Regions:
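Single conserved hydrophobic/aromatic residue that forms the stacking wall/gate
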Residues: 1-8, 12
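Histidine- and acidic-residue-rich, metal-dependent catalytic cores
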Residues: 14-293
């Protein structure tokens, strides 16, 4: 499994911070392409799943760490989906810049995963303010990058169909990838208050809204990162605690587990066990993951 060192992550985080600030001030990009190329070179050609690594975040580096994580997820998912190289590049660039409009904002609503329509609207409005700058900052690729950003942020409002019209346009593949990657990281990242939700909770949300989060894209995310690898401790809907023995590639939330209570083995994919659900995973409080070397 590929290892991403903390030192390397900090370097890329600083580069993203500097690039976002430069574009906002000068309306010109300088290093976006090289950052995107680096991410694609390291994560856009992997043929194995990785344990997705979450860093602790501060108010000062929240958006740059988020942008880096989303860019990494986008590189992996576009590779799994065999998206053509140009759109993969546009998608990773969009991930690097999609939250640029929030950089100078300090309201709590911009940190973490928005769960109400009002929060979503504020996020959308703030992000879209910066998207015109993206097209201006790039000589030739700006239009494609901007469209991916705009489609992804607007599609989020379809989570609240009773309060507004659904988007009518055909989503670009890259926009679907950005939408899924962004939401996954929003949910699983450590908040400024020190709380986080698990990858299981994130995946449950993505799977519950197939009209918003493209199912093919969600499947590609599942093929890119470990959600419930062997050895993961889980809580079942029966109240029991269990250990994952074998993954289920077809239905990742229904693996084979062994109960801590009596060492019984349960294959959650069998019809007889369909009433038993995985409620959540059990992990350390700081939400950090260890990469296998």
């Amino acid at each position: 499994t590929r290892v991403r060192s903390s030192a390397a992550s900090d370097v890329y985080k600083r580069q993203i911070e500097e690039e976002q600030d430069r574009i906002l001030k000068t309306r010109k990009q300088n290093r976006t392409q090289s950052i995107a190329d680096m991410v694609i070179r390291n994560y856009g050609h992997l043929d194995e799943k990785i344990n997705f690594y979450q860093n602790l975040r501060s108010r000062e580096d929240y958006f740059s760490r988020h942008s880096l994580n989303v860019a990494i997820l986008c590189a992996m998912v576009t590779h799994v989906m065999n998206i053509r190289r140009e759109e993969q590049y546009h998608t990773v660039c969009a991930a690097i810049l999609h939250d640029m409009g929030k950089v100078k904002k300090h309201d709590a609503v911009y940190y973490g995963a928005p769960y109400t329509r009002e929060d979503m609207l504020r996020n959308c409005e703030t992000q879209e303010e910066a998207y015109g700058i993206i097209e201006e900052a790039f000589a030739t690729d700006g239009s494609g990058i901007r469209r991916i950003c705009q489609q992804a942020v607007r599609k989020q409002l379809d989570l609240f169909p009773e309060d507004g019209e659904k988007s009518r346009y055909k989503m670009l593949a890259g926009a679907n990838v950005l939408l899924v990657a962004n939401r996954y990281d929003e949910i699983t990242a450590m908040t400024l208050q020190g709380t986080a939700q698990s990858e299981v909770k994130a995946l449950q949300e993505l799977l519950e809204h197939p009209k918003v989060y493209d199912p093919e894209t969600v499947r590609a995310l599942i093929r890119s990162i470990n959600i419930l690898p062997p050895g993961a401790s889980v809580e079942l809907s029966t109240g029991e605690k269990a250990l994952v023995l074998n993954e289920n590639e077809e239905s990742v939330l229904r693996p084979t587990v062994v109960s801590f209570r009596d060492n019984s083995i349960l294959d959650l994919s069998l019809p007889g066990n369909e009433d038993i659900q995985i409620v959540d995973v059990m992990k350390t409080m700081d939400n950090r993951y260890i990469f296998n070397k």
